[in-house]
């Protein structure tokens, strides 16, 4: 018979061996129960799902439909109901994203030459460019030029004065005076800055007369259409009219471009130039020019 101490050691060894067996069996059972939950669809399963989505128009299947589809697809591989549900959800999201991407590409406007020309024409104004191609600055407020200012404004088909050897001559016996580049309403700013002009007309049907013109130069911007209208002489009596308005009655201006005569034509250095108009049937419109 063994002593009690030896019995206690045997019992302790049996307990340790039992614990080791239980741990091994437990660990082995855990590894056997651990399975992969990721679904790997087969080709037949994907084909059937796409037929249901596109041909049968099934976008969000119900619970009964999911069970039936799962039972049908299980014949071709391992699958669960949640795999069917998530496949429809993901496929529907991809379709929405694809439509959105295609829609943004289709709605993007293409920059065609016609649209570019139309955009350029919207910002182009003929009064802001002179014939040398140098752009002029647009005024702060758009100026609406009224061309129908009674009968005093000239039509574009009438002859305009031209410079020949320093003299300003009229092509015909009209009464236009000092209208330079009137087709666009503005004088080009590249010729000695801004210039202003005025003219005096002396209508003589009987004898000669003197026309006085004082020279005053200004550097303010000038628009020919802002000036007052010239008046025409009537009934054969002598009248002295000017192209300026009431504000220019005392100060009449001419173009400060080129000198026409020597110093002997200047009366006393006062800036006034006198010219004798011969007695003719047509009116005498004289316009003298000086450098600034």
Curated annotation (Swiss-Prot):
GO cellular component assignments: nucleus
Xref: InterPro entries: HD, Homeodomain-like_sf, WUSCHEL-like
Tissue: In the active shoot meristem, it is specifically expressed in a small cell group underneath the presume position of stem cells. Also expressed in the floral meristem. Expressed in the nucellus of ovule primordia.
Locations listed in the record: Nucleus
Pfam families: Homeodomain
Stored SMART domains: HOX (SM00389)
Segments of this protein annotated with the region Disordered: 1-40
Listed GO MF terms: DNA-binding transcription factor activity; transcription cis-regulatory region binding
Residues annotated to bind DNA: 34-99
SUPFAM superfamilies for this protein: Homeodomain-like (SSF46689)
Signals that turn on the gene: Repressed by the CLV (CLV1, CLV2 and CLV3) proteins, possibly to rapidly down-regulate WUS expression in apical daughter cells after cell divisions, suggesting the existence of a feedback loop. Repressed by AG at the end of floral development. Down-regulated by ULT1, probably to establish floral meristem determinacy.
Domain of life: Eukaryota
A GO BP entry: anther development
Keywords from the UniProt entry: Activator, Developmental protein, Differentiation, DNA-binding, Flowering, Homeobox, Nucleus, Oogenesis, Transcription, Transcription regulation
Location (main, coarse): nucleus
Basic residues: bias regions: 1-11
Function summary: Transcription factor that plays a central role during early embryogenesis, oogenesis and flowering, probably by regulating expression of specific genes. Required to specify stem cell identity in meristems, such as shoot apical meristem (SAM). May induce shoot stem cells activity in order to maintain the stem cell identity. Involved in the developmental root meristem. In shoot apices, it is sufficient to induce the expression of CLV3, a putative ligand of the CLV signaling pathway.
Quaternary state and interactors: Interacts with TPL and TPR4. Interacts with BZIP30.
Homology family: Belongs to the WUS homeobox family.
Protein name, entry field: Protein WUSCHEL
Originating organism: Arabidopsis thaliana (Mouse-ear cress)
Gene giving rise to this polypeptide: WUS
